[in-house]
Amino acid sequence: MQKSILSSILLLGAVCAQANNYTVTSPNGKLVMNVKCEGGKASYTVDLNGKQMLAASALGLVANYGDFSQGLTMGTLKGAPKHLTYVMDHTKKSHVEKDVYEATIGFLNAKKDSMTLYLHVSDNDVAYKYEMSRPKKDNPKSVIIYKEVSGFNFPEKTTTFLCPQITPMTGWERTKPSYEEEYTPDAQMNVKSQFGVGYTFPCLFKVGEDGWVLVSETGVSSAYPGSRLSDYEPGKGYTVAFPQKGENNGVGSEFAGIPLPGETPWRTITVGASLAPIVETTIPYDVVEPLYEASQNYKPSRYTWSWLIWQDESINYDDQVK
């Protein structure tokens, strides 16, 4: 993948600032993200075509050296319009070119430790992540993140198309969660998930007749666990949840531990009046960079797996070559 980001000389997005309140508008003016800090708590909303896609949804996290979910003071927004272009093989779109707006907002918690919120806004996508700085006191080299309060609070008329998460170390050879449970289409938000442990990314929502929203994550590396969505809670919506205790046969922690300074993965939100922007989005790639350069030009080849056809109980060579 080759990627370049160029500053645009055009007005590709707009920012409106008030005390404890920032409004970021997409390049085409149809998507609006509002970030505010009231009572020491940060939150955001997302509107599309003047219709609310996400109501006030929480921002922040709780770490071992400080609470960044409350007692916050919001600093200055620093941002600029960008023109994003890159080429990548083996994906739904080989050449991507779009206008975006990128920004950062600094926060201080009650102990005056800092957290930076990164924003990426395009015509149908919003993405955000957190950067944690090294505190001056005790100069820790890493941080344990106990939980994110990152929320997705949908209007009450919203219905869901979600894959339920399942409890760990269950199913075939105790390999679950396998992220392949059956889902109920067009379900009500207030119905608890099938196994009571939330839902698997990506998560699709229908906001009445106003549009669709896809919530997911990208930029996950070995430095941070893959996440899921919690069950729905009235007034708060869904929140980012970490792996369950007991996954991976109990090896490792269910918390995130990252070196300092360090970043979380991106939380992505794709919105559209129809499903077209959901299907066509390239946001999983727009906000990340290649981890390394491929040693060769890899080409697809043939493969086989008898279970896909027969649902057989074992896999052997003779069956695979039939």
Describe the residue ranges of each PLM region:
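Generic detector of low-complexity/intrinsically disordered segments
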Residues: 8, 12-14, 206, 231, ...
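N-terminal accessory beta-strand-rich subdomains and adjacent acidic, glycine-rich linkers
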Residues: 23-286
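Catalytic cores of large soluble enzymes that bind and process phosphate-bearing ligands
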Residues: 118, 260, 296, 315-319
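Bacterial Sec-dependent N-terminal signal peptides
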Residues: 1-21
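A short, polar/charged loop/turn motif at coil->beta-strand junctions and beta-hairpin connectors
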Residues: 18, 99, 262, 298-300
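Substrate-binding cleft of carbohydrate-active enzyme catalytic domains
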Residues: 300-322
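Conserved mixed alpha/beta catalytic, RNA-binding, or beta-rich assembly cores of soluble enzyme
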Residues: 275-283, 289-296, 308-315
